[in-house]
């Protein structure tokens, strides 16, 4: 007896899991040729710029020719992904508000001075990429700390209006995979999921073993991959609630009982950021969303990165904040080395995101092959707060739409042209620049 998709979806049950698997078992033969476009867009933001002092070699920007170039120490973690990345020199965000963290954050994804436009992530979520159960996913790690003002955020649903990211991975998990749903880009939910006492997967897939036994090898492998990846995320989130983070209440009975002040303990920041990355990747693997923003902290960050345990920047009884380190003054100042190590750590988290996408098969390649992942910060050199030679890197093959493994010298082009080229690679060929001050598509970046 042939097992059709209707039978599988009926057996799956649970709206939050039915939607992700709706396209899982589509036969490869049914998929015809498609244009070279990306399937998803992810932004990974880190605060306070990079070590690129004027007149000195940048520790962040690649150097060399288009196809023969070297990665500096801050980018060492990207060596395994070099062929899947596009690097840039010379991109500028323009002179307006130059020297300003808030001014940079406002222009970063909107391409418009003062944040006077919809950000690219929001535009793509409602246009080029089509419908998804969750149109847009905006997750943060200590991004809303200290009642952050709107100019601390980088995602603009409309001109002059930002939205706050969700800093709690357990809340995000419940909204994405739990009953009742909810808006993943902020707001409140009416129903939460207990990540400690219940397995959402097992509850929704009671008779999955029977279904699995009737699948072919290819479909069975796809199902196992998605289920195991989802369980891995669930285990991580359960760990956050049940004791992997030592100060959390081990007898926690529901998400609503979490001491949310623990979300802003810097010693927990690395685990929380990893959880948000995992949630973003898994949501996309399940087809829940096609656009995501992961915001690591906020500009002018008070994040004490010297409290990150088991990292090269860990220094007990020594406080070194991200923003504090960025004002290194001169390279001989010890803050400069601390600042450089902090930037290396952020790039390592970006590399982790790329690795998670690369580890998941999709079609004839991987999720990374079909994605565009933008690494960005709101300023260039942290000491001068420059908006020139911005630290932008693209990861992923965009479904064949981008030429990667290259270093592009953009000779002072406005970053609006990069945003427009990204939109083009996502399938929106109606625009060539996004925002203001642009000239058009960046030469050579599109395949």
What is each of the regions a protein language model found here?
Residues 1-447:
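Ligand-binding pockets and gating/stacking loops
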């Amino acid at each position: 007896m042939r097992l059709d998709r209707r039978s599988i979806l009926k057996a799956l049950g649970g709206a939050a899991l039915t939607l992700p698997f709706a396209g899982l078992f589509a036969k490869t033969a049914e998929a015809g040729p498609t244009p070279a476009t990306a399937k998803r867009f992810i932004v990974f933001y880190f605060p306070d710029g990079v070590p690129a002092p004027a007149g000195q070699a940048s520790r962040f920007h690649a150097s060399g020719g288009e196809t023969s170039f070297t990665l500096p120490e801050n980018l060492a973690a990207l060596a395994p992904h070099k062929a899947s990345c596009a690097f840039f020199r010379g991109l500028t965000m323009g002179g307006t508000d130059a020297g300003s963290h808030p001014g940079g954050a406002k222009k970063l994804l909107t391409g418009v001075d003062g944040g006077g436009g919809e950000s690219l992530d929001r535009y793509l979520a409602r246009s080029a990429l089509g419908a998804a159960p969750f149109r847009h996913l905006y997750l943060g790690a200590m991004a809303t700390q200290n009642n952050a003002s709107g100019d601390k955020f980088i995602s603009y649903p409309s001109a002059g209006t930002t939205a706050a990211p969700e800093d709690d991975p357990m809340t995000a998990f419940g909204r994405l995979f739990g009953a009742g749903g909810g808006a993943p880009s902020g707001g409140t939910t009416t129903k939460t999921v207990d990540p400690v006492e219940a397995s959402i997967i097992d509850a929704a897939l009671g008779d999955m073993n029977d279904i699995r036994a009737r699948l072919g090898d290819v479909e069975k492998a796809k199902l196992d991959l998605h289920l195991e990846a989802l369980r891995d995320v669930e285990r991580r989130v359960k760990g956050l609630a049940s004791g992997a983070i030592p100060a959390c209440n081990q007898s926690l009975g529901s998400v609503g009982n979490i001491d949310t002040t623990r979300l802003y303990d810097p010693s927990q920041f690395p685990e929380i950021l990893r959880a948000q990355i995992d949630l973003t990747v898994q949501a996309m693997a399940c087809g829940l969303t096609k656009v995501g923003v992961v915001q690591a902290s906020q500009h002018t960050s008070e994040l004490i990165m010297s409290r990150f345990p088991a990292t090269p920047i860990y220094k007990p009884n020594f406080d070194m904040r991200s923003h504090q380190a960025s004002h290194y003054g001169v390279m001989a100042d010890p803050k400069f080395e601390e600042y450089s190590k902090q930037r290396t750590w952020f790039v390592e988290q970006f590399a982790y995101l790329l690795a998670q996408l690369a580890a998941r098969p999709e079609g004839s390649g991987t999720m990374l092959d079909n994605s565009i992942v933008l690494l960005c910060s709101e300023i260039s050199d942290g000491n001068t707060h420059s908006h020139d030679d911005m630290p932008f890197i693209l990861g992923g093959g965009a479904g064949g739409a981008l030429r990667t493994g290259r270093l592009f010298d953009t000779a002072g082009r406005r970053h609006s042209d990069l945003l427009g080229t990204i939109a083009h690679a996502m399938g929106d060929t109606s625009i060539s620049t996004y925002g203001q001050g642009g000239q058009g598509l960046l030469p050579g970046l599109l395949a």
